[in-house]
A protein has these predicted regions:
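N-terminal secretory signal peptides and thylakoid transit peptides that target proteins
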Residues: 1-17
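Mature extracytoplasmic/periplasmic domains
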Residues: 25, 178, 259-319
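Early extracytoplasmic/lumenal segment of secretory-pathway proteins
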Residues: 26-91
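Periplasmic-binding protein-like
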Residues: 131-132, 192-197, 236-260
Length: 342
């Protein structure tokens, strides 16, 4: 979730080295590998302090970006004990961890609130904590008629006004593939559409923050990014809207799991259950615009209208084939960097 603002790494190494020596401390703690910024603050307020502390469980946040967290999870999977009890990662990274056998299997017996998770988001080794969709976000002052199709991203009248996040190269490539007649298991047509973007002077922006700045200055009028991010920027005063195009959108799910070799597996499972509590879910919705993943988290009607998706829109969500993405990601990145960005 590199879209979230990061804070400096919170050093829990000293604490974790003490855990094996102090059995009570070990049994009353849970170490959560997570993002910082607003995400970490909301976890601290809505899960750590509101739910875990009353149970007598101290939460230590191990804050980092997703790449070092994923690397740590993979590197430690053969160890007798890992350094995290809960790992928070995006769906693609969690797929890889599951395939490598790094995660504890989950069900309603060890995480009771999994029974409230929407069926289309359920998985065997992770919980879906929050979700949104990577879709078209646009400046409502400059584009007064909402886009209807992903092909609008290639409309010559928006020459030089389409911005693309460098970090979201996979999502951008997926949109290009669909626009070119491909599918979630055939990204080959993306190459032609990417080069068309280049000829239309599409701007590649280095970070999520750079996309926000480009919207604010009106350097760009349109991008592909999480609808939740558009909501947050709109709340900050930038006139933005989002649409789920008639061809669909790329869902993005942020998940949490318990490593198989977690020191405090029981507390880790309790933490996953707490993340699915309605109050914790609605707090993320109000602050960050991400949609709850459980059926009993009820949003304010106005907020629901702004951030949620209709059943018809959900039906149009693409179904990413993570095995395909894992197989071809290096090739996609190479084309993105060498040919498209050039």
């Amino acid at each position: 979730m590199t879209e979230f603002t990061r804070r400096d790494f919170i050093g829990v190494a000293a604490a974790t080295t003490l855990l094996p020596r102090v059995s009570y401390a070990q049994s009353s703690q849970v170490i959560v590998g997570t993002w910082g910024g607003d995400y970490g603050d909301l976890l601290r307020e809505g899960v750590d302090q509101a739910i875990m502390v009353p149970q007598g469980i101290e939460v230590l946040q191990d804050v980092s970006g997703p790449v070092p967290r994923r690397t740590k999870l993979m590197a430690e999977r053969q160890n007798r004990r890992g350094s995290m009890d809960v790992a928070c990662l995006a769906d693609f990274d969690m797929f890889t961890a599951t395939e490598l056998g790094a995660l504890e299997e989950l069900d309603e017996q060890n995480v009771p609130r999994m029974g409230n998770v929407f069926p289309f988001l359920r998985k065997s080794h992770s919980i879906p904590q929050i979700y949104s969709a990577h879709t078209i976000v646009y400046n409502t002052d400059r584009i007064t008629t909402p886009p209807k199709s992903i092909h609008d991203l290639w409309d010559p009248k928006y020459r030089g006004k389409v911005g693309l996040s460098d970090f979201l190269f996979t999502t951008n490539t997926a949109f290009a593939a669909i626009a070119g007649g491909g599918s979630m298991t055939d990204f080959a047509p993306a190459k032609k559409k990417l080069m068309e973007w280049r000829s239309l002077d599409a701007k590649v922006l280095a970070s999520t923050e750079a996309v926000a700045a480009a919207f604010k200055s009106e350097e760009i009028w349109m991008t592909i990014i999480a609808a939740a991010r558009g909501y947050m920027w709109n709340e900050a005063g930038i006139p933005l809207g989002h649409v789920i195009a008639e061809e669909g959108a790329f869902p993005t799910v942020y998940e949490a799991a318990v490593p198989r070799n977690a020191r405090n597996k029981e507390n880790g499972l309790k933490y996953l259950d707490a993340m699915l509590e309605p109050a914790a879910q609605t707090a993320f919705a109000a602050k960050m615009g991400y949609v709850p993943t459980v059926s009993d988290a009820i949003l304010d009607p106005e907020l629901d209208k702004r951030i949620n998706f209709t059943e018809a829109e959900k039906e149009r969500f693409w179904r990413p084939d993570f095995a395909y993405l894992a197989k071809y990601q290096a090739e996609m990145l190479d084309f993105w960097n060498r040919d498209f960005k050039g």
